[in-house]
Design a protein with these regions (language model features):
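Terminal targeting signals and extreme-terminal segments of soluble enzymes
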Residues: 1-146
Length: 146
């Protein structure tokens, strides 16, 4: 009987599920992986009281964590473990409790074991909240056996 190979989309979905299973920080964040494909991902988060800072806005670290998680799903979508080498974020506008954040990552360029991804974070009104750029490095291991 022939061995069935995963399609790239199936590989990305399985990679995302494997990461969620093993990522306690993502589980505690309360976000959802809404879409994943090869080199891209979409994660959503409703902002709750526990996400706010002393000014009553969403804490910048929460927004960074959301963007970083989205970047992580995108760069690990090939079933090759990848880690962040460098990440930067620019905050554009404040986020309030009950806002829904939509974070979307897209591969810009992959070269060898390294890659660059851009992530946009928007609110439910499609207002730009933050721009994140992540540089990843594959570490030479699979997330799961194929």
């Amino acid at each position: 009987m022939p061995i069935l190979k995963l399609t790239p989309k199936e590989r990305a979905v399985k990679s995302g599920a494997t990461m969620i299973r093993d990522d306690s920080a993502f589980q505690k964040l309360g976000a959802t992986l809404d879409n994943i494909n090869v080199g891209s991902a979409k994660v959503c988060l409703e902002i709750k009281q526990e996400h706010t800072n002393g000014h009553g806005f969403c804490h910048g670290g929460v927004i960074f964590t959301l963007a970083d998680a989205t970047f992580g799903f995108a760069c690990n979508s090939y079933n090759m473990k990848a880690v962040a080498q460098n990440c930067t974020i620019t905050y554009i506008s404040p986020v309030k409790k009950k806002d829904i954040l939509i974070s979307e990552a897209k591969k810009i360029k992959k070269f060898g074991r390294s890659a660059i991804y851009d992530v946009t974070v928007k609110n439910q009104n499609k207002d730009l909240v933050a721009i994140f750029r992540g540089h990843s490095r594959e570490v030479g291991q699979n997330l799961f056996d194929e």
